[in-house]
Swiss-Prot record:
Enzyme Commission code: 4.3.1.7
Co-factor binding details: Binds between the large and small subunits.
Catalyzed chemical reaction(s): ethanolamine = acetaldehyde + NH4(+)
Sites where the protein binds adenosylcob(III)alamin: V210, E231, C261
Biotechnology: Artificial BMCs can be made in E.coli by expressing eutK, eutL, eutM, eutN, eutS (eutSMNLK) or eutS alone. Cargo proteins can be targeted to them using the first 19 residues of this protein. Beta-galactosidase (lacZ) was active within the BMC, showing the BMC allows passage of substrate into the interior. This can lead to the development of tailored BMCs for specific metabolic reactions.
One GO CC term on file: ethanolamine degradation polyhedral organelle
Pathway(s) per entry: Amine and polyamine degradation; ethanolamine degradation
Name of this chain's protein: Ethanolamine ammonia-lyase small subunit
Length: 298
């Protein structure tokens, strides 16, 4: 699926929901005009906030031949470029930023989604067989199965046999859920209902792994299960969300190739609202083709 097809899907779904299609920002420079580039900053400072935009834009290459090229490269990516070297070693500020980002990523993995936040969203909360974060990280197999209490809760409080069941889980990034929730779940549910699909009761699974959606789909009799789960955080991005969609999942027979994944959902990647529109279209095609993953025809 190319960018033009994605834009057409987003435009169609957003129009059916009665919402305006977000327009891309106008370029800051005219075509052919030379961009105004700031001079690279090579001075290291212990007072600089390592998580600030200034620190991320820092250029550590001393006496560059083409400063404007470095500035444009630094603006074009969130990757660690233009950090410079001190002999064979990274510069102090580059190393400190690396350590700070690494610490932030570890914090994201270890944090818990607050119960108050889940209640504020009006979501039913269930758990996998995991009881705490340490067990979640060391026993991924238990994160693929619902607890007995969770099974009872789903059977008693959720709509049975829906066309589409939407599930939210913390996964390996708490920030991915809390940062993107309001911009992806409401338009996703609205788009599915606007498409005339029977949508199940959305709920939150604490300590869930991707394969847990197979058991959920089997218990509820869902035709399509959509799992929104936090991705493993990287050094530069801890708010990335993934969508794993599968048609008619079964614990015993569904394999990873049966899933369709849309990853990198966040403000710096695929915008959550745009992702919601693409997921709606994906769910419709899964129901039409009665397939998902590699079994879908393009």
């Amino acid at each position: 699926m190319d960018q033009k097809q994605i834009e057409e899907i987003v435009r169609s779904v957003m129009a059916s929901m009665g919402q305006d299609v977000p327009q891309p920002a106008a370029p800051s420079t005219q075509e052919g005009a030379k961009p105004q580039c700031a001079a690279p900053t090579v001075t290291e400072s212990c007072a600089l906030d390592l998580g600030s935009a200034e620190a991320k834009a820092w250029i550590g290459v001393e006496n560059p031949h083409r400063a404007d090229v470095l500035t444009e490269l630094r603006r074009s990516t969130a990757a660690r470029v233009c950090t410079g070297r001190a002999g064979p070693r990274p510069r102090t500020q580059a190393l400190l930023r690396f350590l700070a980002d690494h610490s932030r990523s570890k914090d994201t993995v270890l944090k818990e989604v607050p119960e108050e936040w889940v209640k504020a969203q009006g979501l039913l909360e269930v758990r996998s067989e995991i009881s705490d974060k340490n067990l979640y990280l060391t026993r991924p197999d238990m994160g693929r199965r619902l607890s007995p209490e969770a099974i009872d809760a789903l059977k008693s409080q959720c709509v049975m046999n829906p066309d589409v069941q939407v599930v939210v889980s913390d996964g390996l990034s708490t920030d991915a859920i809390t940062a993107n929730y309001e911009e992806i779940l409401p338009p996703l549910l609205a788009g599915l209902k606007q498409a005339g699909l029977n949508v199940g009761t959305p709920f939150f699974v604490r300590y869930g792994r991707v394969k847990i959606e197979d058991q959920i789909g089997e218990i509820l009799g869902a035709k399509v299960v959509i799992l929104l789960v936090g991705e493993r955080p990287g050094l530069g991005q801890s708010e990335s969300l993934s969508c794993y969609a599968v048609y008619s999942p079964r614990v015993a027979t569904t394999v990873e190739a049966d899933r369709t994944c849309i990853s990198n959902i966040h403000q710096g990647g695929t915008p959550p609202v745009e992702a919601a529109a693409v997921i709606v279209d994906l769910a419709k095609r899964m129901l039409e083709q009665k397939a998902s993953g590699i079994n879908m025809t393009r």
